[in-house]
Amino acid sequence: MKRRRPLFVLGIDGLPAPLLERWKREGRRPALSRIGERYGLRSMDSSLPEVSSVSWTTFFTGKNPGEHGLFGFYDLDPKGYTPRFPTFPGLSSKPFWEEEAARGGRSVVLNVPSTYPARPFPGELVSGFVATEMEK
């Protein structure tokens, strides 16, 4: 079996690529610039709607909102049209780390938005933000 190279993804929510380029030109954020020079930087187009929870879910599933089922930080329950918070276990698509685990790979996933509550998989997952109660 061919050995696969490790993948490291550092996602910075809400950081526009032009701002990062300006910081690099101005000599600001040198550690981030060194990471980019050594490993490469890629920007991604946001999803529609342009909401962090939707964009991150689109990124980690490779599916659009109609396919993965998350359209925002809160939604309406189709049974009673009351507000509800979509949760990670309710997604209709698997994130890439679960797909990789099914092929025998190992993943460590830290603080990725829209991954609460964590669902079991053979790896480590520390859930990222979003609260699941409007009162909190």
Positions of PLM-derived features:
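Generic recognition of stable, solvent-exposed alpha-helical segments in well-folded globular domains
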Residues: 10, 15, 27-30, 54, ...
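An acidic- and aromatic-residue-enriched active-site/binding cleft used to recognize and process polar
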Residues: 12-15, 25, 40, 46-49, ...
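Glycine-/proline-rich flexible loop or hinge segments
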Residues: 14-18, 37-43, 51-55, 73-85
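His/Asp/Glu-rich, glycine-adjacent segments
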Residues: 63-136
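Asp/Glu-centered strand-loop micro-motifs enriched in Gly/Pro and often flanked by an aromatic residue
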Residues: 1, 34, 45-46, 81-89
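Short, structured active-site-proximal loop/turn typified by the sulfatase FGly-forming signature C/S-X-P-X-R
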Residues: 21-59, 63, 106-108
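Beta-strand elements within well-structured catalytic alpha/beta cores of enzymes
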Residues: 4-21, 35, 59, 100
